Regions:
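Hydrophobic/aromatic interaction determinants used to assemble and anchor large protein complexes
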Residues: 1-289
Length: 289
């Protein structure tokens, strides 16, 4: 399963590299090195993947213990993460760069995909999406044939909480970028001035991260109807870890702000712009958490 997963990623990104090279807008004739590298990844990866994947499928079809093995569940859900996360990241890059160009900022100001093109992102989304669809359909078929679902349920639970944390991080970081923007002294224009890419990057993160987080959170909550989910130690551990992380960051942020205020009250001379710069990061982090 480990070799199958690695070879799958090798083939997938080899295809993405090949297609990006073929459809590159700024390259009329791709170099031989670029094409050779992409083709080598594909030609080496395909037979290795097929040998190990078909081997694993035959073993699962003939052995019920193999079919319900934890390592098989880990393969499926890890492979889904390795294909779906790039889909989300490339979609985020598309939105971020589109917003940046709309307000006439340099595309390099985009937090994600500043050096990429829309073709690069669409190719990555398409190829990873096709691979994820195949894996998802195969996983659904496996679920129908499971005689013991406990191992798969445990790994699926962990998979859901990885997405939950991933979406939450995008939301928090996006809100932090937007709030930090509010501390900047407005210049001649609201959007397009120095540092204003923060709010654009933050909005892009919120637009992508919020649906991911809300959907995953609803899925986790709906799963509580199952007795094993409601009593899961993993669920309690994730909730406590998120709560503790939020408390630690809020307390640390409050400490930084109090330090700045105490130094100001004790006579330190700080201009308004300098003061806002010092408190912008801790406050913008503390409020979302």
């Amino acid at each position: 399963y480990a070799v199958a997963l690695i070879s799958l990623e090798v083939v997938l990104w080899g295809l993405i590299s090949l297609l990006r090279t073929m459809f590159a807008q700024d390259v009329l004739f791709p170099t031989a090195d670029t094409l050779a590298q992409a083709l080598a990844l594909i030609l080496v990866g395909v037979p290795i993947f097929l040998v190990h994947w078909l081997w694993a499928q035959r073993a699962a079809a003939s052995d019920s213990e193999e079919q319900t093995a934890t390592v098989r569940a880990v393969f499926f859900y890890l492979a889904l993460l390795f294909t779906l996360v790039p889909v989300v990241q490339n979609f985020l890059a598309l939105i971020d760069r589109a917003f940046i160009e709309t307000v006439r900022l340099d595309r390099s100001s985009a937090l994600f995909g500043g050096s990429q093109t829309w073709i690069d992102n669409l190719i990555a989304i398409l190829m990873n999406g096709v691979a994820a669809a195949y894996l998802w359909n195969t996983l659904r078929a496996s679920w129908l044939n499971l005689t013991d679902r406990e191992n798969f349920a445990d790994v699926r639970r962990l998979y859901r909480y990885v997405w939950l944390v991933y979406g939450l991080l995008m939301v928090v970081f996006g809100a932090q970028q937007v709030l930090r923007f509010l501390f900047f002294i407005p210049e001649a224009t609201i959007l397009g001035a120095s540092g204003r890419e923060m709010v654009i990057n933050g909005i892009a993160l919120l637009l992508v991260g919020a649906p991911v987080w809300l959907y995953t959170w609803k899925t986790c909550q709906d799963a509580l109807a199952e007795p094993l989910e409601a009593a899961s130690n993993l669920r309690l551990g994730v909730l406590y870890l998120l709560s503790l992380s939020g408390v630690v960051v809020v307390l640390a942020s409050a400490g930084v702000v109090l330090d700045v205020l105490f130094r100001l009250f004790l006579g330190e001379t700080v201009g308004l712009e300098r003061f806002l710069q010092q408190v912008s990061t801790p406050i913008s982090l503390g409020i979302p958490l």
